[in-house]
């Protein structure tokens, strides 16, 4: 790595971005979860010797580079983006399952830890470090699949809420297990007290730092109505809360989540115009897509470093232990939550994918840590199984469980829409053929009248359907309003470009249009 200069590093980084963007674009076009596609392609690139890619592979799979990029560069952005757009009201409405699953993370940690000791014969620190690594979940793939199949919004919120908080808990458990656990065990009862104090201190301090910074930056937004500047505020907030918490010995993950939740809810309420909020969200959408694309490609490349020689049996055992622990954690923690569908429990259980955070944490272990190589093999094996096998089977599972049921009346509406579009196309084609081939009016009008009669009948059926399911009509009206607002925005842009109206008037009118678009999105 010493021979690489900054220019070469930039070239390699840009090359990675191009590859990741290309794979992501293809996956999205094919309506497949892009994280899984990136991991698979990254793994293939890592396994196949391609001279063009060798410097790239060497650069990315260097432990310090991977760890820095994932934890310091991308993790604050990904956590901040997710928490920023999570309405606190939604989190409050679903607090019981989210908190229950937070407790379930501890159940999973204990089961994996003790099972790794007894069944895989790992030393105590190694066993519980591995358990902490397996406590973190990565919901990106699952949430993208949820969106594509129309899964209930509440289920998505629970999955995202669980991930935001158990990632923080996983990092805390990892640090305690890796650096303090043996000391606490040697001290006996006193050590248990110290361990509990460290656990509470790290989480509490993270909450305080994130809360204070989130409040301060929210207050700042009251004094500015300048979305580029407020986007910069959000960048500073996410990274400063993470870095400051880490410097103070607190949980940087929890600090970022709390800061972003406050900024995205309280800050948006007291100091952000709808235009500012929309632009901040759009900026972080782009940042998160870029970060996720690079992260999953890097994970795929990194996974190829593992050496499974003579460890296949233990690797499979590790996967089974983690799956059993996840099942126990989900079903035990959610057992007392009333009116929580069992199909949702199955989905949350199988959708608890492991990802980049687990890989980054295990690579951060000191090279002389006892059992480090074994932990690497087991962690990488579970992550690969999780992203590929669970990731590719979650969609069929949703369909089999019926979690992806569409809105009532939607199927009937789509059938009417398809028939109507078919008939409208037929009418246009008849007119075109009549014009080109000089077919007599009497012949064409008879067929056209027949089609128009059928279209009229479809309109009547659609109106009846709208009366039965008014939410379908509301949805169509929302789509129509949104497109009309986009057209209005472009019309103002054209007037400004032709110097028919001043830039000041154009900006004022466009801001009003954006406000209407934001209100429309918030209402639906």
UniProtKB/Swiss-Prot annotation:
What are the record keywords, sorted? Antiport, Cell membrane, Ion transport, Membrane, Sodium, Sodium transport, Transmembrane, Transmembrane helix, Transport
Q: Which Pfam families match?
A: Na_H_Exchanger
Q: How does activity depend on pH?
A: Optimum pH is 8.0-9.0 for sodium transport and 8.0 for lithium transport.
Superkingdom, according to UniProt?
Bacteria
Could you list the residue ranges that cross the membrane? Answer: 6-26, 33-53, 59-79, 98-118, 126-146, 169-189, 193-213, 242-262, 283-303, 312-332, 374-394
Q: Where in the cell is it found?
A: Cell membrane
Q: Name one GO molecular function term.
A: potassium:proton antiporter activity
Supply the InterPro entries for this chain. Answer: Cation/H_exchanger_CPA1, Cation/H_exchanger_TM
Q: Give the GO cellular component terms, alphabetically.
A: plasma membrane
| Classification via Gene3D superfamilies | 6.10.140.1330
Its Gene Ontology biological processes?
regulation of intracellular pH; sodium ion import across plasma membrane
Main subcellular location:
membrane
Family, according to the entry, reads as follows: Belongs to the monovalent cation:proton antiporter 1 (CPA1) transporter (TC 2.A.36) family.
Q: What does this protein do?
A: Na(+)/H(+) antiporter that extrudes sodium in exchange for external protons. Can also transport lithium.
Task: Indicate what this protein is called per its UniProt record.
Answer: Na(+)/H(+) antiporter NhaG
Q: Which gene encodes it?
A: nhaG
């Amino acid at each position: 790595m010493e021979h690489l200069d900054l220019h070469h590093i930039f070239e390699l980084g840009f090359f990675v971005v191009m590859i990741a963007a290309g794979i992501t674009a293809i996956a999205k076009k094919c309506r497949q979860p892009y994280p899984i596609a990136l991991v698979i392609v990254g793994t293939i690139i890592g396994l196949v010797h391609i001279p063009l890619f060798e410097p790239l592979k060497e650069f990315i799979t260097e432990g310090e580079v991977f760890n820095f990029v994932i934890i310091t560069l991308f993790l604050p952005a990904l956590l901040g983006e997710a928490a920023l757009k999570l309405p606190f009201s939604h989190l409050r409405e679903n607090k019981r399952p989210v908190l229950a699953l937070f407790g379930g993370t501890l159940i999973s940690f204990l089961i994996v830890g003790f099972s790794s000791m007894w069944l895989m014969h790992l030393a105590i620190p190694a066993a519980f470090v591995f358990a902490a690594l397996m406590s973190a979940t990565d919901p990106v793939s699952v949430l993208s699949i949820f969106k594509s199949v129309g899964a209930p919004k509440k289920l998505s919120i629970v999955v995202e809420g669980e991930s935001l908080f158990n990632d923080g808990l996983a990092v805390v458990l990892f640090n305690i297990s890796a650096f303090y656990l043996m000391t606490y065990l040697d001290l006996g009862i006193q050590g248990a007290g110290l361990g509990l104090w460290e656990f509470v201190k790290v989480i509490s301090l993270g909450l305080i730092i994130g809360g204070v910074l989130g409040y301060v930056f929210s207050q700042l937004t009251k004094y500015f109505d300048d979305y580029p500047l407020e986007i910069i505020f959000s960048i500073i907030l996410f990274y400063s809360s993470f870095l400051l918490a880490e410097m103070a010995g607190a949980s940087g993950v929890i600090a970022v989540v709390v800061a972003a939740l406050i900024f995205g809810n309280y800050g948006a309420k007291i100091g952000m115009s709808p235009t500012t909020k929309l632009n901040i969200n759009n900026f972080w959408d782009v940042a998160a897509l870029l970060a996720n694309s690079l992260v999953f490609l890097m994970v795929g490349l990194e996974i190829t470093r593992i050496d499974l020689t003579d460890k296949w049996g233990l690797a499979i055992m590790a996967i089974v232990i983690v799956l059993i622990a996840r099942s126990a954690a989900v079903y035990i923690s959610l057992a007392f939550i009333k009116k929580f569908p069992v199909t949702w429990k199955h989905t949350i259980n199988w959708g608890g994918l492991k990802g980049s955070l687990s890989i980054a944490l295990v690579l951060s272990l000191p090279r002389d840590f006892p059992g480090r190589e074994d932990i690497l093999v087991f962690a990488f094996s579970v992550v690969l199984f999780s992203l590929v096998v669970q990731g590719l089977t979650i969609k069929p599972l949703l369909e089999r469980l019926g979690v992806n049921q569409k809105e009532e009346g939607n199927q009937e509406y789509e059938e009417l829409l398809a028939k109507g579009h078919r008939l409208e196309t037929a009418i246009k084609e008849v007119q075109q053929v009549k014009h080109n081939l000089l077919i007599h009016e009497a012949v064409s009008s008879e067929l056209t009248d027949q089609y128009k009669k059928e279209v009229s009948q479809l309109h009547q059926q659609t109106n009846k359907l709208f009366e039965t399911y008014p939410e379908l009509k509301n949805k169509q009206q929302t789509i129509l309003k949104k497109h009309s607002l986009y057209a209005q925005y472009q019309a103002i842009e054209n007037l400004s470009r032709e110097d028919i109206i001043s830039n000041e008037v154009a900006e004022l009118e466009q801001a009003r249009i954006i406000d209407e678009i934001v209100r429309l999105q918030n209402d639906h």
